[in-house]
Structure formats: structure tokens, C-alpha cells
């Protein structure tokens, strides 16, 4: 029996059940255990003010205490500098990496409008300042339903949500206007990750069976760039790696906002899909370029 740890939100349970189905299809028995995290309890602060690993710490501890065998996360929530006894054993194929700007149908605005945008993400806030320079940004926390309800009630003129979360939950946006934002996503946005203990050879072997190689390569490159730059989720950093399997070419674009200035960097490397050292090398190179 594989014990799967997860947070209790609808989105987290969707992700855990997706992993559970993949494992069941391979003949494994599974059970899901819900564990509440700091990020679920503290809803009145920015994530960057709460600390590192706000959605992972309690699940990490449960794994280390042998209460669960694996934990399912949104990969972007896992700190790039993590507990050395834990590792990402598998990632699933990436869903949409896009951010959506969503607003009520009776609101009309343009790039110069003084609108109130709800988001808890420092990256979204910093990048959107270049698109909507007169916008005011307000803290927005809670699950997807809660955020959309607050928008409908008029607490914000617009909010930003990840398209992946909307798709996974099957949420209808027919009551709203929305569009994809032309900004770089958070590193590993739209990717479901499965964590395990580094010394659990059996579980590592099992998770290899559900790992999506291209997504793993791309996410490793993006997260390495962030790690090299430093700062984790407290830094307005975006990155997107895309691997062209036909031409065996990995491309990375990254950007960061420092002192109200948007800095971009990009690069590419020829590599096979399993040459993760080259993905790490490219990530380090671009992260360093943005740092200096």
C-alpha cells in the first residue's frame, strides 16, 4: 500500500488523485492522507512573509516520520533548496503554464486604467506593473472558488489565477472576461510533482514509471535558474524552458524585476532528453546572467 500525502484543497486532491490513478493503473494499491499545511492555515499574509515551504513543510515531516510514503505537490511550491533527505521522484506532464487575468463583465479597462488587481504572487505583481502601471495590487489568498467569489463581489476589479488550476478543477469562467497574460510563469508552474525520501529505493523505482521525462528536464532547468539567482518565492522571477525533442534542443527564457527594472536573459543547449546535467548547466548560466 502506497500512502499518498496531500493538502486538502480541491485542487490538491485533484492532483493527488491523478497520481493515485497512475499508480493504480500500474497495479499498486494506494491510499490518500490529507495533511494541513501552514499555507492552508495562514490566509491573511503574503506567502513571501510566511516563510519557505509554506505548502510543503508538514508533508515533508510526515514523509520523514514514515507517516506517508510520497507527497504530491505543485512543483512550484517546493523550495529549490530543500531537505537533503527528500527528492522529486517524478513529475507529470506539464499542464498550461499560463497566468490568466480574470475580470467581471461589467468592468471596462485598458493599460492606463487605475484598477485593483488581486494576487498573492510577488512575480505577478512585479511583472504586471509593466503592463498596467497605474494598477493597485491587493492581497488575494484562498482557493480558486473563494478568489472568484471575491472578484464577483467586487472586492477587486481583476484577479490573476493559473490556467492549469482552472483546467484541473473544470471551473467555468463564463460569467467573467479573461485573457492569457504575456508574462513568464513561475519556474515549474503547471507541473504536478511527487516527492519521496532520497533513501527509499523501492519508491524511487516505482515513481520512475510515472515520470514525464521532457517535463522533468524543463522543470529542472527552470528551477536551477531560480536557485542560481537566489531568493526563492520572495523574488519576482519568471522562467520557461521548452525542449524540442525532434531537434534535441533545450531553450530557456527567464526574467526578474529588481529596483523596478525588468531584466531578461535566454539561452539554449543541444541535449538528449535524459541529459539532465546539461539542463542544470543551462539553468545555472541563465540564473547567473540575471544575477550579475
Swiss-Prot record:
This is Probable porphobilinogen deaminase. Keywords: Porphyrin biosynthesis, Transferase. The keyword Hydrolase does not apply. It comes from the Archaea. Tetrapolymerization of the monopyrrole PBG into the hydroxymethylbilane pre-uroporphyrinogen in several discrete steps. The gene is hemC. It holds the Pfam family Porphobil_deam. CDD domains: PBP2_PBGD_2. It catalyses: 4 porphobilinogen + H2O = hydroxymethylbilane + 4 NH4(+). InterPro entries: HemC, Porphobilin_deaminase_cofac_BS, Porphobilin_deaminase_N, Porphobilinogen_deaminase_C, Porphobilinogen_deaminase_C_sf. The porphobilinogen subunits are added to the dipyrromethane group. Its EC number is 2.5.1.61. Transmembrane segments: none annotated. GO terms for biological process: heme biosynthetic process; protoporphyrinogen IX biosynthetic process. GO terms for cellular component: cytoplasm. Binds 1 dipyrromethane group covalently. Belongs to the HMBS family. The modification S-(dipyrrolylmethanemethyl)cysteine is found at residue 233. Its cofactor is dipyrromethane. Disulfide bonds: none annotated. The lineage of its organism: Archaea, Methanobacteriati, Methanobacteriota, Methanomada group, Methanococci. GO terms for molecular function: hydroxymethylbilane synthase activity. Pathway: Porphyrin-containing compound metabolism; protoporphyrin-IX biosynthesis; coproporphyrinogen-III from 5-aminolevulinate: step 2/4.
